[in-house]
C-alpha cells in the first residue's frame, strides 16, 4: 500500500534524505539515505515566499488540524500520542480549560524556501548500513517546504453561558483588527471604548517558530509582536522550519525495505476525532465546576470532582495508548480496522461510555446549582462558611461565641458508587460486567430542594440584620443522610441544644433567670457624642461616661443643653438586651429620639417626661422605676454594691424589663408596660448626676 506522503512538519527536524517510519510516525534522525556528494548533486533550493493570516474561532481538534494542514492519518497519530510536536505545533496541545470560555486564535504563516531531491530512482547509490535491518523505516524525505507559523491564542475569562456567543463575536471583531496595523510598528489598533475594555481582559498564549525576546501575554503585547514577525523571517531555509514534508516509499530506492501495508479510513479518523472531542468537552465541564466558588465551600464535593478528573485522566492515558497500539498494528498489517472499532465498542460497554460520563456531570452540575441556590439566599446575611467539622468545632469553642446558629448541608459527600466503578474498571478492565450508570441522587428530588430552600430562608430571617456579638451564624456541611438535605442547628456555648432550630423560645420576662437566654438579643451600644451634655465626659470608645466640669460646647441641635443626658447610637425596634455598670446618681432607660434637647420643661427630663421609661438609682435611697403616666415604683436595696444592671426591651410587646445580673444568673425586679404601644424605634438614654445638686456618677456600657 506504500505510496507518497505529504505531511505537516509539526516542529520535527526533517532533512532531505532522512528516513521515516510511517507506521510509528517516527523520524529516524542522524542518518541520510543519500551521501553528502549525492545530495549536493541532486538537491535544489527554490525561493517560495508567501505570507498569510487567518482568524480561528473554533478550538476543536478538527479545526486545528485544518489550520496546520495536518492530513487525517497524521492527525489520528497525534491524538494517539505517536507524534511529539514542537515549535508552533504545540498549539495543538493548547485546549480551552473551561467550557464557558471564549477563545479566538490569530494565525500568521510565512513560507521561504522549497528544497527537494530530484534524482530519479536507480540513478543514485544509497547507503544501506542503517536500512539493512528489518522494520526500521518505510519512507524517505525527498522535499521540504520551509517557513514559520505563529499562533496567538486569546482567551476570555469564564463567562455566563448566556453571554458566551456574544463575547465570542466581539472577540473575533477585535482580533481581526490586529493584521490591519502598520507593519512598521508605529501603528496601533483602533478600538472603541467597549472593545478596549474587552481587549484588556484577554489573556494571550503564543506558539510560534519565531525566536522572540519575550512572549506576549496581553492583547497589547500581541499587537507589538505581530508587527515584528516579518522582520524575524529571512529568505533562506535556515531562517525557517520544515512546514510541509514530502516522503516517498523507501522501496523506490531499496527494494527490501518495509512497507506501510495499510492506513486507516476517513470514517475511522472522524470517529476518533468525535470521541476525543467529546472527552475534551467533558474535561472542560469538570474544570468549570472545580473553579466554581460554590464548590470551594464544600471540600467533599471538591474532592469528588478531583477524583473524577483523576479517573478521567488515567483513562485518557490508557485510551490514547491503546489507539496508538492499534494504529501501528493496522499499518503493519497485523490487524484491520475492526480492531479499532472493537476498541470503541468495548468503551461503550464500560463505565467510561460517554453517556454515563455526561450523566454524572449533569447530576454533579445540578448538585452545584442546588447548593448555590441555597447559598445565594443566605449570602446577604452576616455568616461564616466553615470548610470542615473541625473548623466548626473550633469556631464554636471561641470564648466570644455564646450562641451559634448553623445552616448544615447534610447530603454533600465524596462517596459515589459510579466513581468507585470507574476506579475499579481502571484497575481491572476485564473484571467488570456491563456498563455502569451513575445513580440519580437527591438532587433530582424537588421535595429535598424545597426543604433546603425553606431552611435557607429561615436561616436568613434569623441572621439578617442581626448585629449581636454573642450570636454567630455559620454555614457548614456535615454528612447526615438521616436528615433531608439541610438542617439548622442551634448551639449554646458549643453544645448542640436543638438540631432542628426554628426560632428562639423566650420565657415570660419575670421568669427569665438564665442570662444566656437574653444574650441572644444582646445589643452592643455606644454613647452618641453629638448628643452628650457638655459636663459629661465620654471615654473607652464612647462606652463610658462620667460627670465633670461644664465645658464650652458647640450649637449642635442634637446636643442636650440643660440636663446631663446622652443618647445611645442606635434605634431599638425589635428585642434588645444590654447591660450597664453604674455608680452614683444615674438614670437609665429608653425614650423617643424626639425628646427635647434645649427645653427647660419637664418633657426633656428623662424619668419625668411622658415619652421616657426609666430606672433611677440614688445612692443611700434605692431605685425608682418610672413607667406610664409618670407613675413611679420604688425599690429599696440594702446592698449598695449594686451588680450590673440588665435591660431587656421588647418592642413588639412594648415592655422594658430590669434585672440584677450576677454571672449568668438574672434577678428580675420590674417590668414597665409601655402604653400606648410604641409607635417608633426608641433609643437607650442615660442621665448622670445633677448640676444643680452635688450629685455625680459614672456609667459604663458593657
UniProtKB/Swiss-Prot annotation:
<dbReference type="Pfam" id="PF24674">
    <property type="entry name" value="MACPF_SNTX"/>
</dbReference>
<dbReference type="InterPro" id="IPR056072">
    <property type="entry name" value="SNTX_MACPF/CDC-like_dom"/>
</dbReference>
<feature type="region of interest" description="Structural FAT domain">
    <location>
        <begin position="266"/>
        <end position="385"/>
    </location>
</feature>
<feature type="region of interest" description="Structural MACPF/CDC pore-forming domain">
    <location>
        <begin position="2"/>
        <end position="265"/>
    </location>
</feature>
<dbReference type="InterPro" id="IPR043136">
    <property type="entry name" value="B30.2/SPRY_sf"/>
</dbReference>
<keyword id="KW-0800">Toxin</keyword>
<keyword id="KW-1015">Disulfide bond</keyword>
<dbReference type="Pfam" id="PF13765">
    <property type="entry name" value="PRY"/>
</dbReference>
<protein>
    <recommendedName>
        <fullName>Cytolytic toxin-alpha</fullName>
    </recommendedName>
</protein>
<comment type="similarity">
    <text>Belongs to the SNTX/VTX toxin family.</text>
</comment>
<keyword id="KW-0325">Glycoprotein</keyword>
<dbReference type="InterPro" id="IPR040581">
    <property type="entry name" value="Thioredoxin_11"/>
</dbReference>
<dbReference type="InterPro" id="IPR001870">
    <property type="entry name" value="B30.2/SPRY"/>
</dbReference>
<dbReference type="InterPro" id="IPR006574">
    <property type="entry name" value="PRY"/>
</dbReference>
<keyword id="KW-1202">Platelet aggregation activating toxin</keyword>
<dbReference type="GO" id="GO:0090729">
    <property type="term" value="F:toxin activity"/>
</dbReference>
<feature type="glycosylation site" description="N-linked (GlcNAc...) asparagine">
    <location>
        <position position="201"/>
    </location>
</feature>
<keyword id="KW-0354">Hemolysis</keyword>
<feature type="glycosylation site" description="N-linked (GlcNAc...) asparagine">
    <location>
        <position position="287"/>
    </location>
</feature>
<comment type="subunit">
    <text>Heterodimer of alpha and beta subunits; non-covalently linked. Also associates into tetramers or even higher aggregates.</text>
</comment>
<dbReference type="InterPro" id="IPR052090">
    <property type="entry name" value="Cytolytic_pore-forming_toxin"/>
</dbReference>
<feature type="glycosylation site" description="N-linked (GlcNAc...) asparagine">
    <location>
        <position position="93"/>
    </location>
</feature>
<keyword id="KW-1199">Hemostasis impairing toxin</keyword>
<dbReference type="GO" id="GO:0005576">
    <property type="term" value="C:extracellular region"/>
</dbReference>
<dbReference type="InterPro" id="IPR048997">
    <property type="entry name" value="Stonustoxin-like_helical"/>
</dbReference>
<feature type="region of interest" description="Thioredoxin (THX) domain">
    <location>
        <begin position="386"/>
        <end position="513"/>
    </location>
</feature>
<dbReference type="InterPro" id="IPR013320">
    <property type="entry name" value="ConA-like_dom_sf"/>
</dbReference>
<feature type="glycosylation site" description="N-linked (GlcNAc...) asparagine">
    <location>
        <position position="530"/>
    </location>
</feature>
<feature type="glycosylation site" description="N-linked (GlcNAc...) asparagine">
    <location>
        <position position="311"/>
    </location>
</feature>
<comment type="function">
    <text>This heterodimer induces potent hemolytic activities (when tested on rabbit erythrocytes, EC(50)=25-56 ng/mL) due to its ability to form pores in the cell membrane. The pore may be composed of 10 alpha/beta heterodimers. The toxin shows cardiovascular effects that include a vasorelaxant action that may involve the L-arginine-nitric oxid synthase pathway. In addition, it displays edema-inducing activities, increases vascular permeability. It also shows myotoxic activities and interferes irreversibly with neuromuscular function.</text>
</comment>
<feature type="glycosylation site" description="N-linked (GlcNAc...) asparagine">
    <location>
        <position position="100"/>
    </location>
</feature>
<keyword id="KW-0959">Myotoxin</keyword>
<keyword id="KW-0964">Secreted</keyword>
<keyword id="KW-0204">Cytolysis</keyword>
<dbReference type="Pfam" id="PF21109">
    <property type="entry name" value="Stonustoxin_helical"/>
</dbReference>
<feature type="domain" description="B30.2/SPRY">
    <location>
        <begin position="505"/>
        <end position="702"/>
    </location>
</feature>
<dbReference type="Pfam" id="PF18078">
    <property type="entry name" value="Thioredoxin_11"/>
</dbReference>
<dbReference type="GO" id="GO:0031640">
    <property type="term" value="P:killing of cells of another organism"/>
</dbReference>
<keyword id="KW-0528">Neurotoxin</keyword>
